[in-house]
Amino acid sequence: MTKTDPAPMAPPPRGEEEEEEEEDEPVPEAPSPTQERRQKPVVHPSAPAPLPKDYAFTFFDPNDPACQEILFDPQTTIPELFAIVRQWVPQVQHKIDVIGNEILRRGCHVNDRDGLTDMTLLHYACKAGAHGVGDPAAAVRLSQQLLALGADVTLRSRWTNMNALHYAAYFDVPDLVRVLLKGARPRVVNSTCSDFNHGSALHIAASSLCLGAAKCLLEHGANPALRNRKGQVPAEVVPDPMDMSLDKAEAALVAKELRTLLEEAVPLSCALPKVTLPNYDNVPGNLMLSALGLRLGDRVLLDGQKTGTLRFCGTTEFASGQWVGVELDEPEGKNDGSVGGVRYFICPPKQGLFASVSKISKAVDAPPSSVTSTPRTPRMDFSRVTGKGRREHKGKKKTPSSPSLGSLQQRDGAKAEVGDQVLVAGQKQGIVRFYGKTDFAPGYWYGIELDQPTGKHDGSVFGVRYFTCPPRHGVFAPASRIQRIGGSTDSPGDSVGAKKVHQVTMTQPKRTFTTVRTPKDIASENSISRLLFCCWFPWMLRAEMQS
């Protein structure tokens, strides 16, 4: 369905920081193409986009012969051409230079505004440089033509309070940033925008993960220590990689690179914590833990509130410095042990959390009431249990028997042996099939065959088989997550034990993605996701900017 523009609305009053400019004069219709260009800019009234009769599509396609007739027809008015430019589709945005030239041929002043969006041709040109939807080359051609005719870089849209440089930074078009700043006044590069907490173009590029635009702005003298209304420098508005979903691996890498770039650009005199803090990147994680009296597998307290098990300590790809990875007892975390496509440890979803080393402390767990710490006893007959926690076999010694292949050696902290019935996380019942070290995480792990198909695998993880069970019946758990509820279900003659295929020590995080795309590809995705920014109605434009 073809969307049409609503009745013209008066744009909001100008903000305090908008540059002084000549008064715009409303004009009812566009002048004839043969008329000379006006001396003063005007605001053109809103009009619907023209379409050919019996046209099959809902958008204007400049490549279609019928649409070309309308585009080059002298009777097509400037407001109608502005309505075409507003359509956020590749067919239109790739021809921004052609459409813009037609607008100029009709006598349009270089600083004329679209009455619906309050945007000038230069604003539209910068928006049309977005990768994926627009064409940077076509946008640069039109921008150079407009600047040569005297287009004002400082003009702002009264709906978004953004100038042309802000649009170029938001849509990550470094070529346009260079064109706009060439010959512009020095204060333009650090001009702020109220819709981005009075941040500069560098703040806008940082918050939108526009690495190319940020580099270009720094090359042209953008101030990396300028603070917005919240007191943040550009490095502090870069999205946190740990808050990104697992399918945003490339974006997390861009966020890390962008933050590092902006931090290194900040002068040392600026009181930015990340710059002034010492760098522990080269300190091994085990030394850091030893200094704190901790080791992997210890129970820890995070921020004095959340308890969990320490699973990782070391440097990461998502941020500089030393980080600890904790498997929380409850699903109150943010990940499953991986961030930005890089796996550091394994835990159930929403139970993994990364934090700085200073935020953890050793937790003292109360001894569990249902599991005692006494040595393992022979298989129990529950018919002879006389009371809670009291059994008639007390004091009896375990009768030696020939161990099966699946039996375990006595280890500190072991609560069950192969063949024992256990309860996992207080919910799932199963039988222990494996106990020992694994390749996928440090420490000792129990491999359990669950009674119901609520597991995650068939006894193998990352190509290493630890035991055999039906698909989706296998699960691994640390000792703190299991509780023995019965004796062994295997007879002494059982010959199937869990045999590990091979032993390797995992020293590097394992990536869960195979390809890394360029920042330009990422910018394309970001541009596609910004369609709402350029929707048809100005109140939706403003809502997008405020979000």
Curated annotation (Swiss-Prot):
<dbReference type="InterPro" id="IPR036770">
    <property type="entry name" value="Ankyrin_rpt-contain_sf"/>
</dbReference>
<feature type="lipid moiety-binding region" description="S-palmitoyl cysteine">
    <location>
        <position position="535"/>
    </location>
</feature>
<feature type="region of interest" description="Disordered">
    <location>
        <begin position="1"/>
        <end position="49"/>
    </location>
</feature>
<feature type="region of interest" description="GoLD">
    <location>
        <begin position="488"/>
        <end position="547"/>
    </location>
</feature>
<dbReference type="GO" id="GO:0032588">
    <property type="term" value="C:trans-Golgi network membrane"/>
</dbReference>
<protein>
    <recommendedName>
        <fullName>CAP-Gly domain-containing linker protein 3</fullName>
    </recommendedName>
</protein>
<keyword id="KW-0040">ANK repeat</keyword>
<dbReference type="GO" id="GO:0018230">
    <property type="term" value="P:peptidyl-L-cysteine S-palmitoylation"/>
</dbReference>
<feature type="compositionally biased region" description="Acidic residues">
    <location>
        <begin position="16"/>
        <end position="27"/>
    </location>
</feature>
<dbReference type="GO" id="GO:0031115">
    <property type="term" value="P:negative regulation of microtubule polymerization"/>
</dbReference>
<comment type="function">
    <text>Functions as a cytoplasmic linker protein. Involved in TGN-endosome dynamics. May modulate the cellular compartmentalization of AKT kinase family and promote its cell membrane localization, thereby playing a role in glucose transport in adipocytes.</text>
</comment>
<dbReference type="GO" id="GO:0035371">
    <property type="term" value="C:microtubule plus-end"/>
</dbReference>
<dbReference type="GO" id="GO:0005802">
    <property type="term" value="C:trans-Golgi network"/>
</dbReference>
<dbReference type="GO" id="GO:0005634">
    <property type="term" value="C:nucleus"/>
</dbReference>
<feature type="repeat" description="ANK 2">
    <location>
        <begin position="160"/>
        <end position="191"/>
    </location>
</feature>
<keyword id="KW-0564">Palmitate</keyword>
<dbReference type="Pfam" id="PF01302">
    <property type="entry name" value="CAP_GLY"/>
</dbReference>
<dbReference type="InterPro" id="IPR000938">
    <property type="entry name" value="CAP-Gly_domain"/>
</dbReference>
<dbReference type="GO" id="GO:0005829">
    <property type="term" value="C:cytosol"/>
</dbReference>
<dbReference type="GO" id="GO:0010828">
    <property type="term" value="P:positive regulation of D-glucose transmembrane transport"/>
</dbReference>
<feature type="modified residue" description="Phosphothreonine">
    <location>
        <position position="374"/>
    </location>
</feature>
<feature type="domain" description="CAP-Gly 2">
    <location>
        <begin position="436"/>
        <end position="478"/>
    </location>
</feature>
<feature type="domain" description="CAP-Gly 1">
    <location>
        <begin position="314"/>
        <end position="356"/>
    </location>
</feature>
<feature type="compositionally biased region" description="Polar residues">
    <location>
        <begin position="400"/>
        <end position="410"/>
    </location>
</feature>
<comment type="subunit">
    <text>Homodimer. Interacts with AKT1 and AKT2; when AKT1 and AKT2 are phosphorylated and activated, affinity is higher for AKT2. Interacts with ZDHHC13 (via ANK repeats). Interacts with ZDHHC17 (via ANK repeats).</text>
</comment>
<dbReference type="Pfam" id="PF12796">
    <property type="entry name" value="Ank_2"/>
</dbReference>
<dbReference type="GO" id="GO:0045121">
    <property type="term" value="C:membrane raft"/>
</dbReference>
<keyword id="KW-0472">Membrane</keyword>
<feature type="repeat" description="ANK 1">
    <location>
        <begin position="117"/>
        <end position="158"/>
    </location>
</feature>
<dbReference type="GO" id="GO:0001934">
    <property type="term" value="P:positive regulation of protein phosphorylation"/>
</dbReference>
<dbReference type="GO" id="GO:0008017">
    <property type="term" value="F:microtubule binding"/>
</dbReference>
<dbReference type="InterPro" id="IPR002110">
    <property type="entry name" value="Ankyrin_rpt"/>
</dbReference>
<dbReference type="GO" id="GO:0031122">
    <property type="term" value="P:cytoplasmic microtubule organization"/>
</dbReference>
<dbReference type="GO" id="GO:1903078">
    <property type="term" value="P:positive regulation of protein localization to plasma membrane"/>
</dbReference>
<feature type="lipid moiety-binding region" description="S-palmitoyl cysteine">
    <location>
        <position position="534"/>
    </location>
</feature>
<dbReference type="GO" id="GO:0005795">
    <property type="term" value="C:Golgi stack"/>
</dbReference>
<keyword id="KW-0449">Lipoprotein</keyword>
<dbReference type="GO" id="GO:0035594">
    <property type="term" value="F:ganglioside binding"/>
</dbReference>
<dbReference type="GO" id="GO:0098840">
    <property type="term" value="P:protein transport along microtubule"/>
</dbReference>
<dbReference type="GO" id="GO:0005938">
    <property type="term" value="C:cell cortex"/>
</dbReference>
<dbReference type="GO" id="GO:0043065">
    <property type="term" value="P:positive regulation of apoptotic process"/>
</dbReference>
<feature type="region of interest" description="Disordered">
    <location>
        <begin position="365"/>
        <end position="413"/>
    </location>
</feature>
